[in-house]
Amino acid sequence: MLNKTNNTKNSISNKYSKIIKGLENIFEKIKKELVKKKELSQDNFKVWEEKNQHLVHGFAWIATYIEALRQINNWGIELANKNKLNEFEQLILDISFIEYIRQILNGIPMSQTEFIKITDFESINKNDELKISENFNFSNVSELKERLVKIAINNDNIITLENTGLETEYEQIREQFQKFNSLNVCNNANKWHLEDKLIPQKIIDDLASLGVFGLTIPEKYGGLGLNKLAMCVVSEELARGYIGVGSLATRTEIASELILNDGTETQKDFWLPKISQGETIPAACFTEPDSGSDLGSITTKAIKDDGKFLISGNKTWITHASRSNLLIILARTNPDILLKHKGLSIFLVPKNQGKEDEFFPNKSISGTEIKVLGYRGMKEFELRLDNLEVEKISLLGENENSGFSQLMKTFESARIQTAARAVGVAQNALDLAISYASNRKQFNKSIINFERVYNKIAMMIIEIALGRQLTYFAAKNKDLGFRCDLEAGMAKLLCARIAWSCADNSLQIHGGNGYALEYDISRILCDARVLSIFEGSAEIQAQIVAKGLIGR
């Protein structure tokens, strides 16, 4: 048995590591081509990228696929080293490479109508394709998928179908929140969604008692002091129950990281214990009606007045704005709009909590609810700030014009957490697909036995595993203190698309019933759609990844 395991380990290491090396060579050829074109254009990156978006963003997608395959291969090797690479995990590994190599060669879907393949680049020829494709038998993939799904049906009592490779402590955390979902969330999520009301306060109180809001806050400030990988596991499981519940922690994660990174000691001592205990519920006020991805163009002003600041302007897409009692406001402290992001500051502004019949009791804050398709439970608002008086001590770090750089430090964690939420949403869609397809019978057999059904389910399984490992890789890098903007961006880019694909395919498996509001999958489809829009749209995310790759 030991020899067999060693042979398996060596086979994985040699076969797929060699393929990844070949993909890395292709990546370098494309990168050199793009760098040369950029240099010849004499444009800065932004101008050049806007003229060549399809190829530049396509490069980001190809790089993301290569990184995802690298991480799933590392996962397989690690499991083999621990004698835990079972048939199911081996099938995930094999199908992942077959399917993603096929897409790299024939077209990666950047969206439903946009595809990129390596031969779209001048530097890649048919010989490059052949060196990669000759390693695979694409004709037997359906048989592999059928076997994968048959094993999955018998594994449906396991929280994650595959062995994630994480240490026991993380899987214990996962189990704790899976039980929380089963008792409190799963049977209520569709009701909360259809009623379009706030998630009950009791859920927030229960999450606070579990330490969710202080998950990564140091113990000295009342938190649990856990790492970003633990945050991923918690976010993933909570979002698997309901994305609204999974996103409650995101509000506190952004706020606490801002304060931890750049707050004064007084601000840390005052706010962090309250956030940890769930006493303070923050809302991030960054986006404006005419400033979404381009935060440098915001116009909300913070004007000094007798030792205080008066903030005026409009904000939009403010999640949980009414129930929150702390607004994290990004405003312009330097009136020169040409300074763009260099003239912005962040303010920690306490406010009174709203109620269902009075959203904003503060006289200087007014707002209207934005009705949304999905991602409900916290409510979205457009806010009007009219000479909102703010004490000087509310200025983050008491540093003016540093807001954008302060905010940038949180982007890695925010995108990692969003990727984890996307994995949770995708896993929920998969859970429902397996259950429905196993129980739904047509033509005297369960529909899961039809090729086009089990092929869909198999793709969900392998893509969730790919997205999960890419997300964990980004989180581990963050925990080690490494710069991980690329890894976080790749995870967010890929996992958002995976969530939408899984939700869409799961609904298709449900057929007409999936279109009925009473079925959970109709909600999950609505929830999944937002993941490629917020925390950096898919287009902006691809731009950022490409810029990082070409600039390094």
What role is predicted for each listed range?
Residues 2-241, 245, 250, 262-267, ...:
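Alpha-helical interface subdomain recognition
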Residues 223-226, 293, 357-361, 394-400:
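Cytochrome P450 core scaffold surrounding the K-helix E-X-X-R motif
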Residues 278-286:
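A short, Trp-centered hydrophobic/proline-enriched beta-strand micro-motif
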Residues 290-293, 317-320, 337-338, 372-379:
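Short Gly/Pro-enriched turn/cap motifs at secondary-structure boundaries
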Residues 300-302:
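A structural signal for short hydrophobic beta-strand segments in well-ordered beta-sheet cores
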Residues 308, 312-363:
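A short core secondary-structure module
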Residues 355-388:
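Flexible, small-/acidic-enriched active-site or ligand-binding loops
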Residues 383-405:
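Long, acidic (Asp/Glu-rich), low-complexity accessory segments flanking structured domains
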